[in-house]
Design a protein with these regions (language model features):
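Active-site C-terminal subdomain of aminotransferase-like
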Residues: 80-193
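Conserved PLP-enzyme active-site core in the AAT-like
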Residues: 1-122
């Protein structure tokens, strides 16, 4: 594991990434925007660098609120992303028990996804356990499906325009808080613009 430290703009140093990757690189895992609220404008270039050496790119969607309706992981070429439903989709953390996650993968990784997967045969949905290339089952339980139902209802209720408005308000709130923090004597942020 190689940690890439931020450059003068507060995002991982792209030159450090170029120096770190090789034919032995398995993957890059990155969050965008960073937890500091800084957007990595070179995210597509990061993905291209890792793909050029045969690595995969995993997008941690922990801070997805600032991206709804503005950009998509697919647009940057990510191979896999996972969602923190309790952060971005109004589902309480744990939701009365162990959480249920959501992840998306590109077509070439689909056969490796943990079993079972939910499939549709044209008439009904079913759980598919017959996945010979899968990493198998991760837990004895299925998580808490209510988290997924809440997430689905949240997305359907808001629709595309509402989801984009969430992103716009998230960015506005982040910038407002940044300005307010910088008004406090003794507080500075190394990457504040």
């Amino acid at each position: 594991v190689i940690t890439l430290y931020p450059d003068e703009n507060g995002v991982p140093d792209i030159d450090a990434l170029k120096a770190a990757v090789s034919e032995h690189t398995a993957a890059l895992m990155i969050t965008n925007p960073e937890d500091t609220g800084i957007y990595n404008e070179k995210i597509k270039e990061f993905v291209d660098i890792v793909h050029a050496v045969g690595g995969l790119c995993v997008y941690d969607q922990a801070n997805l609120n600032g991206l709804f309706g503005i950009t998509r992981a697919r647009d940057a070429g990510f191979d896999m992303c996972h969602y923190n439903l309790h952060k971005s989709f109004s589902s309480p953390h744990g939701c009365q028990g162990p959480a249920a996650g959501a992840q998306c993968v590109c077509e070439k990784l689909a056969k490796f996804v943990a079993a079972p997967t939910v499939e549709f045969d044209g008439e009904k949905y079913y759980l598919d356990y017959n996945r010979p290339d899968s990493i198998g089952k991760l837990r004895k339980f299925y998580g808490v499906p209510a988290v997924l139902v809440r997430t689905y209802a949240y997305i359907r209720t808001l629709g595309p325009d509402g989801m984009k408005q969430i992103a716009e308000m998230s960015i506005l709130n982040n910038n407002y808080m940044l300005k307010k923090l910088l008004e406090i004597k003794g507080i500075s942020l190394p990457y504040a613009k």
